[in-house]
Amino acid sequence: MTDLRRLTAIRGLRNNNPGNIRMSDTTWQGKISKEFNTDTNKAFEQFESLEYGLRALMKNA
């Protein structure tokens, strides 16, 4: 069984950004603006939901 506390430690899941897409000027759908981004070093995009993060990953591929 997976320990859910461990999953929150994974940056990509915490930011709803499984592709660990770096911060950019791209206007991704569902992107959280830099002022509201809670990533500690603000180097990675953050999305409203995992679905938006997966969408960005697929479009970025």
Model-identified regions with their sequence ranges:
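Cell-wall polysaccharide-cleaving catalytic domain and substrate-binding groove, primarily
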Residues: 1-61
